[in-house]
């Protein structure tokens, strides 16, 4: 039986997530939230109604592994453990939070964290995304991740998901709300403008 001082117990197996939109990424530098341990982390926004059969299999494998580590660690299944409302699980409905990109009740999100090692990030051509080109990986883009599942009872009790490595899959609108100058002006080219020589002194 796990005791109140037992550290988090991670599984050794790695699983692959379905595609998700990236939210709150801290993958190039560690960040601390609410005074907690600094760690590399991000939140994935998943849309199960859009899953392919392969995506569903990956999703089910993650849920199954969470159930297995819960049973192994606490000797009880997740359903039983959830009778204690303080028991933490990683999955949350999209309408539980009021952030940009959230609000959809059909969306499910969970956070992934790794306090020790910066995740490796690749693009679809298997080229690395590093701190030097970090703008390529941003809140709002699509990615997938390798993860592991673990149970913990050091600070509260629950099951959670650890972050392995990441692959960016595609671009999308940034959750930060910023656009590039090319996006702003590229669809409306300037033709025949030479700068002009009008007297603008009346605008001073």
Model-derived segments and their meaning:
Residues 46-50, 149-151, 170:
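Beta-strand elements of well-folded, non-transmembrane domains
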Residues 1-16, 173-204:
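Acidic, gly/ser/pro-rich intrinsically disordered tails
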Residues 153-173:
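OB-fold/S1-family single-stranded nucleic acid-binding modules
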Residues 122-142, 150-160:
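Exposed beta-sheet edge/beta-hairpin loop segments within beta-rich domains
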Residues 39-41, 107, 142-146, 158, ...:
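Broad gene-expression machinery/nucleic-acid interaction feature
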Residues 43-45, 111-113, 146-148, 165-167:
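Residue-level recognition of well-ordered beta-strand positions that form the cores
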């Amino acid at each position: 039986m796990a005791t109140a001082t037992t550290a988090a117990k991670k599984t050794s197996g790695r699983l692959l997530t379905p595609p998700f939109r990236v939210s709150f990424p801290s993958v190039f530098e560690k960040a601390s939230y609410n005074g907690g341990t600094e760690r590399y982390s991000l939140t994935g926004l998943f849309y199960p109604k859009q899953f392919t059969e392969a995506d569903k299999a990956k999703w089910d494998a993650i849920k199954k592994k969470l159930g297995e580590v819960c049973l192994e660690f606490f000797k009880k299944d997740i359903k039983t453990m959830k009778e204690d409302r303080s028991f933490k699980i990683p999955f949350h409905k999209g309408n539980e939070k009021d952030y940009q990109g959230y609000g959809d009740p059909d969306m499910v999100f969970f956070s992934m964290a790794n306090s020790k090692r910066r995740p490796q990030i690749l693009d679809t051509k298997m080229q690395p995304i590093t701190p030097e080109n970090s703008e390529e990986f941003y809140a709002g883009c699509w990615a997938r991740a390798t993860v592991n599942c673990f149970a913990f009872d050091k600070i509260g009790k629950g099951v959670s998901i650890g972050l392995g490595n990441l692959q960016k899959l595609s671009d999308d609108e940034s959750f930060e709300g910023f656009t590039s100058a090319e996006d702003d002006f590229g669809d409306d080219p300037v033709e025949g403008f030479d700068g002009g020589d009008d007297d603008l002194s009346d605008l001073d």
